[in-house]
């Protein structure tokens, strides 16, 4: 079963438990990892596993805060979010135990972002109506530019220092 929603609103009947849970690019939008992992653990059977795929900084954790108009990434894409450090999830093992942790250098996500940008540009005519529907026709061009800049920014960030500064981190947790 694949569930796509705001995890804050997600709830399962207490009788429904899972053996595997996968989270892809969701933890960056959350702040209270202890609470989040406790909720996820409550949905899991004993010995079940959680796989987390998340963007991280190799060393530092920082929040996405909107302080002024220059903070467009925080305002439009990661409102209230956080860029965790690669080791941050190591500190939240009350409900789930970390079994393994590895990372993929950022150049892979650089290439992904560049491919998404190229695909977006190649399909502009078919995407503009979708963007207009999502953001309103008056804002469509603005959001077209925001998305282009987003992909360019991600490509530059994740390619920086040979992909060793911002990375993709993977974690495997198990419920005792």
Task: Map each language-model feature to its residues.
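A short SAM/SAH-binding and catalytic strip from SAM-dependent methyltransferases
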Residues: 19-32
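A short glycine-rich, Lys/Arg-flanked "PGG" loop and its adjoining helix->strand segment in the class I
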Residues: 34-49
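Substrate-binding/catalytic lobe of Class I Rossmann-like enzymes that use SAM or dcSAM, i.e.
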Residues: 56, 62-168, 174-176
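Conserved SAM-binding strand-loop segment of SAM-dependent methyltransferases
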Residues: 1-9
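Phosphate/diphosphate-binding loops
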Residues: 6-7, 24-25, 36
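A short acidic, Gly/Pro-enriched loop at the edge of an enzyme's catalytic core
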Residues: 8-21
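Alpha/beta-hydrolase-fold catalytic nucleophile elbow
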Residues: 53
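Short conserved AdoMet
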Residues: 31, 45, 93
């Amino acid at each position: 079963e694949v569930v796509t929603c705001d995890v804050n609103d997600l709830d399962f009947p207490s009788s429904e438990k899972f053996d595997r849970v996968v989270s892809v690019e969701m933890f960056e939008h959350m702040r209270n990892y202890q609470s989040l992992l406790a909720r996820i653990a409550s949905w899991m059977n004993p010995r079940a596993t959680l796989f987390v795929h998340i963007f991280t900084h190799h060393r530092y954790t920082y929040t996405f805060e909107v302080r002024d108009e220059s903070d467009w990434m925080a305002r439009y894409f990661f409102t209230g979010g956080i860029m965790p450090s690669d080791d941050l999830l190591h500190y939240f093992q009350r409900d789930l135990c970390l079994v393994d942790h590895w990372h993929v250098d950022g150049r892979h996500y650089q290439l992904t972002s560049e491919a998404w940008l190229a695909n977006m540009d190649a399909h502009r005519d078919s995407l503009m109506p979708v963007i207009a529907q999502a953001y309103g026709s008056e804002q469509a061009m603005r959001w077209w530019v925001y998305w282009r800049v987003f992909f360019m920014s991600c490509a530059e960030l994740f390619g920086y220092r040979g992909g060793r500064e911002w990375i993709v981190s993977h974690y495997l947790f198990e419920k005792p």
